[in-house]
Every structure is written in C-alpha cells, then in structure tokens.
Amino acid sequence: MKKIITALFLSVGLVSFGQVTTNPDTVCINAVGEQYFVTNTPGSSYSWVTTGTLASGQGTNAITIDWGGTAGLYPNAVSVTETTVSGCPGNPVNLDVYIMDLVLLGTGTYCITDPTFTLFANEVGGTFSGNGVVGNDFDPSLAGTGTHVITYSLSGCSQTMNIIVDNIPV
C-alpha cells in the first residue's frame, strides 16, 4: 500500500495539504490492485481522480487502482481532495505515476559453443537471473542445452524471456 503523505493546516476554516513525499510512484505495466491512501480525518470525505481505473474506495481516505498497459510517466495520475465535515475543500494533492514496461533483448536460439553475451533491458538497474546468467551476461555452455527462462527484476516488476541452447550438430 502506498501512502500519500498530507499535512493538515486550519486557517480561517480552510484546509490545505502539504507535499507528497514520494513522487513519482513507479508501478508495473498492467498492475492490478495498487493501493493509495492519505491520513484519515474523522468526518472528512475524499474525492479521488486518477488516470488509471479506480477499482474501489472513492469517498474514503484509501483507494485501489488498476493501471493500464501503456508505459510512461503520467503527471498528476493520482489526485485527492479532502473535504472537511463542515464542507470546506482543501487543495488537491497530486502524485505522478511512472508505469514501467520491461523490454528484454537477448531472446533466441544459441549453440552451446556460442560465446557469452550481454543481456539488455530497456530499464537499467535491475537484476537478471536464471540458468547460465552471471551478472548481466548469459553463458550458453554454463546453462547447458534446453530452454532457459531468464527473469529480469526491477522495482518490484519482472519480465521473463526464453533462451534456447542447442547442441552443435555432429
């Protein structure tokens, strides 16, 4: 669950909110059930606006969003406005969202005698794992013959690809 930090200040009956502490939020492409919340003020209601699909929670201090299948940075993708029990609305608090789509290069069929090669992902800083993987490199002879599932993980997102290693013809 992701918390949007807000600060409440009363000034002549008006409510305003502080800044969000983590911005932008990073989610995986097609993420389902991402939760966002602000500190609950008894008696207040909350109006949420999002570029994702609001799955549940409108009117409360906590919502669930399903994100779509188009990667990119979405400014003000989550916005919440608190209205006090006396009907005074605060200023909206906005959160940018980066929808991450991991694209991997290196899939294909290789011979067991082929040299070690470097695996690539469109987003840097993640970790490759699987048979034959050493750091960011794939070694066909270390992996052995067969189909190998290689996984790349970054910021809670992961993507897989298949690499096939064949014996050399006799």
Predicted regions and their residues:
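Bacterial Sec-dependent N-terminal signal peptides
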Residues: 1-21
